[in-house]
Amino acid sequence: MQALLQEILDHVHPLLAQGQVAQYIPALAQVDPNQLGIAVQSLDGQLHCAGDAHTPFSIQSISKVFSLVQAINHSGEDIWSRLGYEPSGQAFNSLVQLEVEKGRPRNPFINAGALVICDINQSRYATPTLSMRDFVRRLSANPRIVSDAVVAESEYEHRARNAAMAYLMQAFGNFHNDVDAVLRSYFHHCALSMSCVDVARGFAFLANGGLCPHSGEQVLSRRQAQQVNAIMATSGLYDEAGNFAYRVGLPGKSGVGGGIVAVVPGRYSICVWSPALNASGNSLAGLRALELLSERMTGSVFSAIS
């Protein structure tokens, strides 16, 4: 496994020069694009990694999965009265669709949907930022995970479009808490700093029917884990989810920090990171690495069982 992972990283390394780090978040624009790491966590506890797998990075939209799981934990099916689970077919920060559909976001992985989920969690937790941090620490078995205050503040200073979404949803009666407070929580979630190892371990419960393999905690029911994986498969990579399903064939979630996490139900959770992005905001080398790994080792969830 170790040799295979290193071989894949060597193969995709030339792609680092073809992507570009996220420019619209100033703190992320300073990240060295020549970094590349991968970690594979098996359900029997084995961890395999290569490259910069232990280097922390800003998980950004990967945090939307953790937020969704928190909301499902305390509110269950009730959350779907406020948002859907359909692909949007629009940019992740589109206002047009939100206006047409009267403030009800298509799914929890576009920005408007993630803000609704944060609004739901804001009503539940006295300190949402700390609750999220502690939740992620528990899932990843790493008590040192923190949110990068510099990144969070950088995002807050460029909050206009996200604030516009929140106020638009508030106008339609679908946003209940103080907009500024929810935005603060949202940006601190996005600014969580985790390594490939942390993320792969933190998502292992979704490969294991909702059961965290290292702690024995039933994070979600088996059915709920299936549902989260389904939304990741249809909506997890911005407007490139179809491409990811076609090329990789696994439930996944990406972030503009360059991370992509993927789940192989019953087998593995995987995280790859390279901050050089393609035009859709997904890691260029990361996508190709996961495609090669799917071909060589994991297989697609759409494959026939042999």
From Swiss-Prot:
GO MF annotations, alphabetized: glutaminase activity
UniProt keywords, alphabetically: Hydrolase
Keyword field contains Hydrolase: yes
Residues that bind substrate: S61, N111, E155, N162, Y186, Y238, V256
Catalytic activity: L-glutamine + H2O = L-glutamate + NH4(+)
EC number(s) from the headed UniProt entry: 3.5.1.2
One of the protein's GO biological processes: glutamate biosynthetic process
Domain of life: Bacteria
HAMAP family assigned: Glutaminase
Subunit structure of this chain's protein: Homotetramer.
Recorded family membership: Belongs to the glutaminase family.
UniProt name for this protein: Glutaminase
Gene: glsA
